[in-house]
From Swiss-Prot:
Homodimer. It catalyses: ATP + H2O + proteinSide 1 = ADP + phosphate + proteinSide 2. SUPFAM superfamilies: ABC transporter transmembrane region (SSF90123), P-loop containing nucleoside triphosphate hydrolases (SSF52540). This is Exotoxin translocation ATP-binding protein PaxB. CDD domains: ABC_6TM_CyaB_HlyB_like, ABCC_Hemolysin, Peptidase_C39_likeA. The chain crosses the membrane at residues 157-177, 195-215, 273-293, 299-319, 392-412. It is a multi-pass membrane protein. It is found in: Cell inner membrane.
Length: 711
């Protein structure tokens, strides 16, 4: 095998590895800052300096010795440290094929190595890396323990609920004693006066029991509803704070299905399961009285409890697997349904309704089948519980009758004992019958945790700088969307001056739109810096940045609100004059004025009530209304008719006045008047200059594209 890396730039490998690993943990690191602090002589970062540098960026780094067979159990990605300086990053291990995915720090590309190849380059030194944020994230992850702080928050209410539960158990204890007195004393001695007293007392106990039970349910439901509101609010805030990459890697329907699992948790919190748990916790009160009546009968009841537990343990793994399958099928249905409704125009235009219906029928059948299997297994579980209950009842009846006949127990005591045992067994049976709900809520918490445990965009500690001027610099940019994905941008250097209008053209997939995503801080480059007014965006607060950049895409989404609300989306209290001014700049005021309700016209879902050109002009007005210093047009006019495009281009000079404008376009006519035109090909800038200058190079890509559009 050839050496993994050459020694050409091995001094930079440790530095580059730290930058990449820090970015993985959403921590912006400046290579120049590391060099200045930890490698001032340029000799390369040694191990001690590397660990200190990591610590300075709130990363917890630890060097350990590991054998190859222990690597699958470590937290990845990790840095494989080599004595010769040829370090590399281990990102993933496929234990089935015994292959290793590494990131080559020389070629700056991922590589897949076999076990033999990996063994040749692995020296046993591993640097494990975690961030304090990730450690805190693990401690604060969403699972059953999330509810503990919520319970502590409402501890006074829950203490009151527990006190009420104790009183309910005491009332439940009194009722069997009354029945015993009636059977053993009143009936034998024909004591009508005693019967009347006991009946009145029993009625009072029943009334108190009903009132307390209703009060407990009300208070408990009220508290759990507040927890439900907090969870729902936290979920939505967290969902909106997730990075763009989270949504790009998941289907919309799958995310919706996970969010809908909140309903399952809500039903669990407000249902009978938790009150049954409380009843079970306080049922120990009955055992002392039951033991007083008959130790033998009490032992039978006690022996039945492990049977319920064993049956639940036996059936739980099977039920959980089937619930998992049911969720997966339901998520597939949700995704397909969302996709079908979103693409309804295409489906009808292509007349593929029968094919889509066929797919839906198959997926629906799979879901119904999975749901049926869950129901069957849950029924088997409930019948097993019933079998144990009936068996215990028969044994107690037989044994109790023997004790009565032998004189060890009175009839009243036997009846009272059975009533007491019923109070003990009832919550156990309810919990066993509700075991499916427990399994379901466990699945729901796991699925919802996929959303709530996903790391959000890191805003803490980021700089909120003054209003930007508009100087933009892309410095040595190298970027890919995933570690094992192809390079999208490679060694891109571009400087845009304040107030300059830049056109960016090139074939599809050349990296044009990716540049603007980096400018909006949706992603952090693998290498290099994106600067605005000399400030590294990796260190800037994304919200501060995005509020000062206006963006118009090819397919803009309007919300189901009025035109005014859509234009003033960032500030609903915005003066109407400011809204109208932006609409005039975008060439939208005239057609809005002709509408029946003007600016109060509802646009429909995703702007369905407007034409494509009208939607685009409203989107431009929305981008302009805050007077951004940087404006991005990403294929903003490519889907417009010529009249709508002409209206926008006519106002372009006024729109661009005093701003830095980046126009990405396939139509070269859109960028002809730009101050400079950047031509991109396969992630590189291959040409730059004015329209007339680029046409002079007849071997250039711009000339070729211009000739194609002139035909």
């Amino acid at each position: 095998m050839e050496p993994l890396m050459s020694f050409k730039q091995k001094n930079d490998y440790g530095l580059h590895a730290l930058v990449i690993l820090a970015q993985y943990h959403n921590i912006a690191v400046s290579p120049e800052e590391i060099k200045h602090k930890f490698d001032p002589e340029g000799k390369g970062i040694d191990l001690v300096a590397w660990l200190l540098a990591a610590k300075s960026f709130e990363l917890k780094a630890k060097k350990v010795k590991k054998s190859i067979d222990r690597l699958p159990f470590i937290h990845l990605p990790a840095l494989i440290w080599r004595d010769d300086g040829q370090h590399f990053i281990l990102t993933k291990i496929d234990t089935q094929t015994n292959r290793y995915l590494i990131f080559d720090l020389e070629e700056r590309n991922p590589k897949v190595l076999s076990a033999v190849e990996f063994q040749q380059v692995f020296q046993g030194n591993v640097i494990l890396l975690t961030s304090r944020a990730s450690i805190m994230g693990k401690l604060a992850k969403f699972d059953f323990t999330w509810f503990i702080p919520a319970i502590i928050k409402y501890r006074k209410i829950f203490v009151e609920v527990m006190i009420v539960s104790i009183f309910l158990q005491l009332f439940a204890l009194i009722t069997p004693l009354f029945f015993q007195v009636v059977m053993d004393k009143v009936l034998v001695h024909r004591g009508f006066s005693t019967l009347n007293v006991i009946t009145v007392a029993l009625a009072i106990v029943v009334i108190f029991e009903i009132v307390l039970s209703g009060l407990r349910t009300y208070v408990f439901s009220h508290s759990t509803s507040r927890i439900d509101v907090e969870l729902g609010a936290k979920l939505f805030r967290h969902l909106l704070a997730l990075p763009i990459s989270y949504f790009e890697n998941r289907r919309v329907g799958d995310t919706v299905a996970r969010v809908r699992e909140l309903d399952q948790i809500r039903n669990f919190l407000t249902g009978q399961a938790l009150t049954s748990v409380l009843d079970l916790l306080f049922s120990f009160i009955f055992f002392a009285v039951m033991w007083y009546y008959s130790p033998k009968l009490t032992i039978v009841i006690l022996l039945s409890l492990p049977c319920y537990i064993a049956w639940s343990i036996f059936i739980s793994p099977i039920l959980r697997r089937r619930l998992d399958e049911k969720f997966t099928r339901n998520a597939d249905n949700q995704a397909f349904l969302v996709e079908s409704v979103t693409a309804i125009d295409t489906i009808k235009a292509l007349a593929v309704t029968p094919q889509m219906t066929n797919i839906w029928d198959k997926q629906l059948a799979s879901y119904v089948s999975a749901d049926f299997r869950v129901t069957v297994l849950a029924t088997i579980g409930q019948q097993g519980v019933q079998l144990i209950q009936k068996t215990v009842m028969i044994i107690n009846l037989w044994l109790g009758a023997h004790l009565v006949i032998s004189g060890d127990l009175s009839i009243g005591q036997l009846i009272a004992f059975n009533m007491l045992s019923g109070q003990v067994i009832a919550p156990v049976i309810r919990l066993a019958q509700l075991w499916q709900d427990f399994q379901q809520v466990g699945i729901s918490i796991t699925r919802l945790g996929d959303v709530l445990n996903a790391p959000t965009e890191n805003f803490q500690g980021k700089l909120s700088l003054p209003e930007i001027n508009g100087d933009v610099t892309f410095k040595n940019i190298r970027f890919r969307y995933k570690p094992d994905a192809p390079i999208i941008l490679n060694d891109v250097n571009l400087t845009i001056k304040q107030g300059e209008v830049i056109g960016i053209v090139g074939r599809s997939g050349s990296g044009k739109s990716t540049l603007t995503k980096l400018l909006q801080r949706f992603y952090i480059p693998e290498n290099g810096q994106v600067l605005i007014d000399g400030h590294d965006l990796a260190l800037a607060d994304p919200n501060w940045l995005r509020r000062q950049i206006g963006v118009v895409l090819q397919d803009n989404v309007l919300l189901n609100r009025s035109i005014r609300d859509n234009i003033a989306l960032t500030d609903p209290s915005m003066p109407m004059e400011q809204v109208i001014h932006a609409a005039k700049l975008a060439g939208a005021h005239d057609f809005i004025s002709e509408l029946r309700e003007g600016y109060n016209t509802m646009v429909g879902e995703q702007g369905a009530g407007l034409s494509g050109g009208q939607r685009q002009r409203i989107a431009i007005a929305r981008a302009l209304v805050n007077n951004p210093r940087i404006l991005i047009f990403d294929e903003a006019t490519s889907a417009l008719d010529y009249e709508s495009e002409h209206i926008i281009m006519r106002n372009m000079q006024q729109i661009c006045h005093g701003r830095t404008v980046i126009i990405i376009a396939h139509r070269l006519s859109t960028v002809r008047k730009a101050d400079r035109i950047i031509v991109m090909e396969k992630g590189h800038i291959v040409e730059r200059g004015k329209h007339s200058e680029l046409l002079e190079n007849k071997d250039g890509l711009y000339y070729y594209l211009n000739q194609l559009q002139s035909i």
